[in-house]
Amino acid sequence: MKFIIKLFPEITIKSQSVRLRFIKILTGNIRNVLKHYDETLAVVRHWDNIEVRAKDENQRLAIRDALTRIPGIHHILEVEDVPFTDMHDIFEKALAQYREQLEGKTFCVRVKRRGKHEFSSIEVERYVGGGLNQHIESARVKLTNPDVTVHLEVEDDRLLLIKGRYEGIGGFPIGTQEDVLSLISGGFDSGVSSYMLMRRGCRVHYCFFNLGGAAHEIGVRQVAHYLWNRFGSSHRVRFVAINFEPVVGEILEKVDDGQMGVVLKRMMVRAASKVAERYGVQALVTGEALGQVSSQTLTNLRLIDNVSDTLILRPLISYDKEHIINLARQIGTEDFARTMPEYCGVISKSPTVKAIKAKIEAEEENFDFSILDKVVEEANNVDIREIAQQTQQEVVEVETVSGFGANDVILDIRSVDEQDDKPLKVEGVDVVSLPFYKLSTKFGDLDQSKTWLLWCERGVMSRLQALYLREQGFANVKVYRP
């Protein structure tokens, strides 16, 4: 079998040296991706296309599908490569190939020709088109918007009968631009923004700020691995996970409610910049869109950018949510994003949309930056290729209950402000307050002879924190959902 890879048009308008470099990199990327399907596969680069030849017919569909997801490819032609003698021979071969496909349809013939011949491309189109029209009674020529377009390519003494054309994702080959670090949360925005930078030729590494235990991290790892495996598997990348619960806890205790969102984002950018510097990455990527939430106003984005010299790229800055969700659906991350948890207790009740620099800096003076340094130092860095095995581990299930027994105590894990605003009172059972960000250090001090029923507003944080406690060896935890 044979495939002809057509280059993304922006590659073809580059200078000769740049174009050759891009084609060379794309050829290497194709080899890296396809070697898993057929080790005997041949990839040959030319000035205006790349040729892929494979022997294992059983892998035809898999190879074709993989090619449509490699950045830098405009479209793929699946072809049958045969010799020919003259125009009539071209017609006979086209008739044998396309007869069934053209019956009862309108059609036109389009020919591309390279090399020296006694005929022009238009002459071949007329000759073959006329012959097909005469020999297939139910077919009819229609030059504008036909049902079927018969594509032929003539190169020297070879005829390429095009059996199918398949669109690629375009863009630049990965590796033609410098590395970036994507701040990935597993939601719609960060997945799409990561894809957009891969499509633009960047090797995308991933940085995840864990706010909710193993279950959330496993979910985000699956998203990152999916994106890499589907669009960027030609290159090795890193997945860096930072336990940000201590930072969130410090913010909730030390920072004014209205400033929390901007301060949290500033802390994330500081941490990600340290990771980027450690690995020689040139830019950060976020999924922020202008005005989508309170921290994404121009004033707040400028204050967030100010904490780091690292370039921050925001490919979705002008996109609306519907457009982002449509893109997520196209690339296959929509289902991941819809099931990714959101966290109660991490969001300000009355966030500022126009933060003042002096006020933000004053709030941050109360923050213990050694906590930030520590979580960055302890960040977990893995090769994304290892995630496939790691994410197969089963997360321990935690029982969810709607009632309670004599030995049960409800543990309200909301933030202090939320507890003050809406105190939880349940008749017939004790309620103890312990904010979620203190569970890792304070839960062991509680009476372990009791069964603790974790509760929060949405039920997401309580489940994730219960999973975390179970992982730490505490079997006396359940989730309370009345």
From Swiss-Prot:
Keyword Repeat assigned: no
InterPro entries, sorted: Rhodanese-like_dom (IPR001763), Rhodanese-like_dom_sf (IPR036873), Rossmann-like_a/b/a_fold (IPR014729), ThiI_AANH (IPR020536), ThiI_fer (IPR054173), ThiI_N (IPR049961), THII_Thiazole_biosynth_dom (IPR026340), THUMP_dom (IPR004114)
Annotated positions binding ATP: L183, I184, K265, G287, Q296
Places the protein is found: Cytoplasm
A Pfam family reported for this protein in Swiss-Prot or TrEMBL: THUMP
Domain THUMP: 61-165
Catalytic residue positions: C456 (cysteine persulfide intermediate)
Stretches assigned to the Rhodanese domain: 404-482
UniProt keyword Protease, yes or no: no
Keywords attached to this entry: ATP-binding, Cytoplasm, Disulfide bond, Nucleotide-binding, Redox-active center, RNA-binding, Thiamine biosynthesis, Transferase, tRNA-binding
Family listed: Belongs to the ThiI family.
Matches recorded under PANTHER family: TRNA SULFURTRANSFERASE
UniProt name for this protein: tRNA sulfurtransferase
Organism of this sequence: Salmonella schwarzengrund (strain CVM19633)
